[in-house]
Amino acid sequence: MAEPVYRRVVVKLSGEYLAGPHSFGIDQATVDRIADDLIAAQKLGIEIAVVVGGGNMVRGVEVSSQGVSRPTGDTMGMLATVMNCLALEAAIQRKGAPAQALSAFVMPQVCELFTRAAAHKALAEGRIVVLGGGTGNPYFTTDTTAVLRAAEIGAQAVLKATNVDGVYSADPKKDPAAKRFDRLTHSQAIEGGYKVMDATAFALARETSLPIIVFSIAEPGAIGAMLRGEGRGTIVAG
């Protein structure tokens, strides 16, 4: 078995993926399978933090299009990520592995506040750190949150888990001629307008020299495979 390429990473999970085959809510079987993948990856000797989205509950942009102000809609979306964060933390803990939920919002009855010190401590103690609440500020996506948190905690890469095996020139489900890229620079990803992450996330990754690895999480063990450099995906770096 190949040695891991990285020793500390941030994994970005979409809220929509946590819904599994449903259009809304949390599919426990999907959450449990992701928990298994994270635990197996951690056993490779890797420190893992996870940023979860909230699109399976609330999407701030969609709510704001219905008359709610954008800051309020985004706050609703960020609170939805905390629910997903708690669900994933609980699934990991039920399987006997240590996990720590941290939120960008002060909510002591629910979980600890995210600080760099708290994240470093939890990772050093061997916990899988699950991050909710986005950045705590409106107008920023959870993709940007993942890059921001990775830079803050000194992670070596961001693993962007999706339902496709990398970055394509077009939607491969709609265009059979779509080309998959093995590598892109951050600037190429921004200029190409690829929808896998927003431009702010790519720009911050470029500024902080953080590689982003885009891969499909559909197959069990995909996270560990990518960390060993054995999986199929797109590396965005340089």
Swiss-Prot record:
Coiled coil: none annotated. One of its GO terms (molecular function) is UMP kinase activity. The keyword Nucleotidyltransferase does not apply. ATP binds at residues 12-15, 55, 59, 162-163, 168, 171. SUPFAM superfamilies: Carbamate kinase-like. Inhibited by UTP. This is Uridylate kinase. The lineage of its organism: Bacteria, Pseudomonadati, Pseudomonadota, Alphaproteobacteria, Hyphomicrobiales.
